[in-house]
């Protein structure tokens, strides 16, 4: 496998991991991508992403009906592999798309908080702005306040689970769908059924105002999935009122793409000019498998999803005017 101009200069044949709690070490191999990224002068924004790290200290868990094999012991090392690469690139920020931590079935609040603090310390090795998206597992055993006070977002986004920011000529909007209903009852301490997921009325009204403010192209981040028309294996993973969110996005005429995690196998869909990229879960399976990526937005508003290792790459063309 040959390294091109956008891969790490440092390569090795293997990924070395230390599964002990709080320990992580990774030697990066040459990542594989299968798309051509335009030169920097033709890009207006670039950012790195990871999703579904599910950091915790517990045995491998197999979930047959999801074809899921969650190898928690390697999550920190795989995250380090991502941040090591991100630190070699010129990025506007990095973002994790939810389910940052997990918990033990017999765990407690303090132990679960330590998982969150540990994975946040690892993520903070990235030398730049870092953002977080709320995922359902982020509220196992801990409260909403526990989560937002133990992760750090830049500036006005700190302490919030939904927010917007502008970087590099692109507006980014983060939504929180970890609500049990549209009235605003948030997940907390495991008091929820993960398939019941909503963007509440108050947040949806805020979202519509954000879509109408400014003139930049927009990328939306969620943990749970919006592509509700893709019936089949993903049915339990959709936001229940996704149709309302998607309608607002389509009416705005500004949204280029929506990125999410949650469905660990990944998915891609496009509807009415908006691209829906569901990224694969980092926790799945043992090294050398890993999944993370970098997104680049071109001056022509093409979105390039540069997948590394086992993650897929996409070229998302903007809708024709």
Predicted regions and their residues:
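Short active-site segment of divalent metal-dependent hydrolases/proteases
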Residues: 55, 102, 138, 226, ...
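N-terminal active-site segment of His-dependent metallophosphoesterases
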Residues: 27-110
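Extended active-site neighborhood of metal-dependent phosphoesterases/phosphodiesterases
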Residues: 30-41, 65-69, 105-213, 244-255, ...
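N-terminal secretory signal peptides and thylakoid transit peptides that target proteins
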Residues: 1-19
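Alpha/beta-hydrolase fold active-site loops
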Residues: 45, 92, 162, 170, ...
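Active-site glycine-centered loops adjacent to acidic/histidine catalytic or metal-binding residues
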Residues: 52, 98-99, 135-136, 223, ...
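Short acidic, glycine-rich surface-loop motifs adjacent to enzyme active sites
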Residues: 214-229
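Residue-level marker for buried hydrophobic side chains located in beta-strands
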Residues: 47-49, 94-96, 132, 220, ...
